[in-house]
């Protein structure tokens, strides 16, 4: 069975892992890093992904970051005359992770387990599956990030324990409470905030820098796109620095200019000031944490371990806040950047049978239901219900002789339908005429192991049935997804072709250089006619490079390579002959020296005879 990879598709960074020899292993990217920035850039028709895209973000306005924050919405990115959905941008990131995994494993990868924030709604989960499909991946399972982290943390743990997974990533926050032991993982409750993460901590530092610079220079940097990108990079670096030191220097020379000349930003940021700036953000993580404890029917003292996930949990104020709330020192035995991908790989191992005796019971993060008379939200499945699950309820008509009913499917916790998230609508028609309240309409909700919702409505009188699989609210049809899959494949092919062209040019340039050196080294050791032939072939290759015709470059390169190889062979042969001649000459002269040697007679003198 081919490998199923585990992917943590993050807001800021992504990570891919696989089961090898019974253990989950992170797959490094070609740059040697274990995580890849979730950044995509477009430049002169070329797509850049990861570290290379992040490095040029300051100078390239066509750079997309933190796209995960827009998953499941109708948000679009307009670049070079084309609109991209969040699914398409995410698919470009997934394509890179897929290619890196294939290079590492030496085999084609077609299946994946992808993680999502536990608090993602159905639209966001469906959008993630669509992104996988566009990238050429069959998404076998969607796993909640805190659950994946718990899988990686608890796989070898045999003792029963209750853990709290506190997951503060680049753009989302989740908290889950699980009971685990001896291969059994049960999520008791989950909560979170999909609009809170490390990006927001960067933002408060940026706002502070903008305010301080304006106070000092009277210039508002927030209107300058390039300056703001430099500020974002500096803010992110300062945030990371302050996890290890108590103050850091932010220095951005030539950040802008006015009539008096260039302006530089120089500022010292202390950890205390950063804590003050981000205090509200830290506090916002504690509300969902308390709610999860309450939903699980537990107090802080019932928690055995606190597992921190996500790069933002390295912030000292965050660690201090969770320690204060739970009374526990956070567990430091997992890498917060990698543990989710490792857990996804474990889940992939469960699906392939590589990992045995693991039972995972997850929950739905939000309540599900329909709109009933008066715009009320009637819940059929309460939040934190173990999935997969199915629930039915019978409803009736609101008016006499009503021929159809609209089923408005919603997800959320508010009392009124208008305040919750619409997942979809469908209609059950051809209801026989009857007084209101008489027809029996059974509505059934099914949630699968991915947290994806199916809803059906059935008229119990006629057995007529209508169903809907909720698709993402971004409204991507199957046709649109298939078209995007084809575009993604075409782009991957184009990227491969472009790389091959670049490599061909580099090889041709190198050959021109080495030819010039070889001709110089040959000097008068070969016929002028042969040298002229090589010169002509070299000039032909140079012209082909200038014309930038791939076929001509390849043909001219092959022709020159053949001539240079023959010349080089001749040079080596001459060098070998010269060396042999020198060795023979050395042996001859040694023989002559032997002929001139005279054997001397000697006589032993006895000192006693001299006396």
From Swiss-Prot:
Residues 596-611 have a biased composition (Acidic residues). Residues 575-611 are annotated as: Disordered. GO terms for molecular function: ATP binding; ATP-dependent protein folding chaperone; unfolded protein binding. Induction: By stress conditions e.g. heat shock. Disulfide bonds: none annotated. InterPro entries: ATPase_NBD, Chaperone_DnaK, Heat_shock_70_CS, HSP70_C_sf, HSP70_peptide-bd_sf, Hsp_70_fam. Transmembrane segments: none annotated. The modification Phosphothreonine is found at residue 172. It holds the Pfam family HSP70. The keyword Nucleotide-binding applies. Keywords: ATP-binding, Chaperone, Nucleotide-binding, Phosphoprotein, Stress response. It comes from the Bacteria. HAMAP family: DnaK (MF_00332). Acts as a chaperone. Belongs to the heat shock protein 70 family. This is Chaperone protein DnaK. It comes from Shouchella clausii (strain KSM-K16). The lineage of its organism: Bacteria, Bacillati, Bacillota, Bacilli, Bacillales.
